[in-house]
A protein has these predicted regions:
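Charged/polar, solvent-exposed surface patches and flexible loops
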Residues: 27, 31, 65-68, 80, ...
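Intrinsically disordered or highly flexible coil/loop and linker segments, enriched in small
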Residues: 7, 72-76, 148
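Structured domain cores in non-transmembrane regions
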Residues: 22-89
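Acidic, proline/glycine-rich low-complexity IDRs
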Residues: 112-160
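Short, flexible beta-strand-to-coil junctions
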Residues: 2-8, 45, 152-154, 158-160
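N-terminal ordered "arm"
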Residues: 1-36
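Extracytoplasmic/secretory-pathway segments with low complexity and glycosylation-like composition
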Residues: 78-79, 83-120, 137, 159
């Protein structure tokens, strides 16, 4: 961040880690956090596209809070998830209804995991499930009737 000095004033720059402590910000730059007399000149953030030169300290802290509330799987696949969600806030709002299948690479893996976690099928033996359950058909059904995002590190089941 740097101050926006008027003619003849010295420009002060300082690097802050998030979340930004407002008191430290005001002390280091010598201006109020609400003044708007500063601008962001550099940033290294996963959600950098949502931060602009005039983003306020409070907005930065809010974005940082939302990002930190995402699961580690969602943080790891943040860029992929943004192909489905409009922005960080939209992802943050839906974070608790997104189901992550971190060990799944294909939809058949998801079908198997769903079956293993479904109490309806708990009483069936593994042999019975393996021989009589059509995982390919169930995977196709899931894909046709659900919304999934397949990533390098797992599969995300998204809200409709």
């Amino acid at each position: 961040m740097e101050t926006r000095g008027t003619t003849g004033e010295e420009t002060i720059s300082y690097w802050f880690d998030l979340p930004i402590d407002v008191a430290e910000f005001e002390e280091k730059l010598g201006i109020g956090a609400e003044s708007g007399d500063y601008r962001i000149i550099e940033k290294v953030l996963p959600y950098a596209d949502e931060v602009h030169e005039h983003t306020s300290v409070y907005q930065l802290n809010e974005l940082d809070f939302m990002y930190r509330q995402l699961s580690s799987d969602m943080q790891e696949e943040y860029v992929s998830l943004l192909t489905v969600f409009e922005n960080l806030e939209a992802l943050y709002i839906c974070r608790n209804v997104i189901i992550v299948y971190p060990d799944c690479k294909i939809m058949i893996d998801v079908a198997r995991q769903k079956l293993m976690n479904d109490p309806t099928f708990k009483h069936l033996s593994d042999d019975c499930q393996e021989y009589y359950f059509d995982f390919e058909a169930y995977a196709s059904h899931l894909q046709e009737h659900g919304k999934f995002l397949v990533t390098e590190h797992g599969i995300f089941e998204l809200p409709e």
